[in-house]
Amino acid sequence: KENGLDKNTVVIYASDQGFYLGEHGWFDKRWMFEESYRTPLLIEWPGVIKPGSVNNDMVSNIDLPETFLEMAGVKVPSDMQGRSMVPILKGKTPSNWRKEHYYHYYEYPGSHMVKRHYGISTEQYKLIHYYYDIDEWELYDRKADPQEMKNVYTNPAYTSVRKNLHKRLTKLMKKYGDSEELAKSFLPN
């Protein structure tokens, strides 16, 4: 305050992903379950963000560089994978803002012993594929099952949801230059 920085300084509090303390039978992190998937992000931007406001749009750590560049008035390179959050921070979420997240964890076998997996998370659903020495799919309805304890992948009531998520997952993998073939290329010999 003494130097007036409280009037023109953006303050951001973010964290690494959450850490399991026995949820789902695990310790550590890296899994796609909400306990380690969701991370805090608090931003104060004097004169721009309304104090005390809350936004639930899907943002990602890959959006931070683009956001910082736009805040600084620097042109964002077109080959970056994230999107600037500035419109959201100003209370004007773009109509084409993401409705899902893509996640891929490659480091198995390894010291953490977290199985290789990738998936898609939407506001209501999460589809996860475990691979390498297994081939297992999981689907969670986060509104009906917020703790993600009941896998409904084979439940006939979720057939259309499952098919839709598979299509969206394939589209995201292409968007980010990922594929099952690429994932398999990381497997040890």
Predicted regions located by residue number:
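Short acidic-hydrophobic sequence patches enriched in Asp/Glu that either
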Residues: 33-37, 57-60, 77, 81, ...
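Histidine-centered active-site microenvironments of extracellular/periplasmic hydrolases
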Residues: 1-53, 60, 111
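Structured segments of extracytoplasmic/periplasmic soluble domains
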Residues: 2-3, 71, 155, 168-176
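Active-site rim elements
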Residues: 48-59, 71-76, 149-158
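Generic structural marker for isolated residues within well-ordered, non-membrane alpha-helices
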Residues: 65, 149, 169
